[in-house]
Amino acid sequence: MAKKIEAYIRLQVPAGQANPSPPVGPALGQRGVNIMEFCKTFNAQTQGLEQGMPIPVVITVYSDRSFTFVTKTPPASILLKKAAGITSGSSRPNSDKVGKVTRAQLEEIAETKMPDLNAADKEAAIRTIAGSARSLGLETEGV
């Protein structure tokens, strides 16, 4: 028989840097999950990724206090800001442009994000990422 699911916990944790301090500790502690076990397995799983890159994770907590987790791809906004070489988006994205991204950069980001996007094909994924870029105040070339 399958275990009974008690809760889903959604967090953004820096790759390879999970530790018991907030936000990880309190979120898992109130559900009775072994925090150090999560930190060790998460850090091992995200070891190959760029250190410090925020990784969304969905933790499924079961009634016997065991857990499983699924890591997602980094948020599109972070990948776009990194590609454009900026630290934050525009406060007025329609009028103030803060940077540029090329079609090649959009394709690369779309390829990375494809497992998490609900796009039918690569072209639709590129258009989705281009929309995110425009909402950050980035100019999109070739889209």
UniProtKB/Swiss-Prot annotation:
Its domain of life reads Bacteria
What Pfam families would the database entry show? Ribosomal_L11, Ribosomal_L11_N
Assembly and binders: Part of the ribosomal stalk of the 50S ribosomal subunit. Interacts with L10 and the large rRNA to form the base of the stalk. L10 forms an elongated spine to which L12 dimers bind in a sequential fashion forming a multimeric L10(L12)X complex.
Modification comment: One or more lysine residues are methylated.
The record ties this protein, via HAMAP family, to: Ribosomal_uL11
Function description: Forms part of the ribosomal stalk which helps the ribosome interact with GTP-bound translation factors.
Q: What is this protein called?
A: Large ribosomal subunit protein uL11
Q: Which gene does this sequence derive from? A: rplK
The UniProt entry's sequence similarity note says: Belongs to the universal ribosomal protein uL11 family.
Q: Which residues form the signal peptide?
A: none
- Molecular function in Gene Ontology: large ribosomal subunit rRNA binding; structural constituent of ribosome
- Which BP terms in the Gene Ontology apply to this protein? translation
Keyword field contains Transcription regulation: no
Q: Which GO terms describe its cellular component?
A: cytosolic large ribosomal subunit
Q: Which UniProt keywords apply?
A: Methylation, Ribonucleoprotein, Ribosomal protein, RNA-binding, rRNA-binding
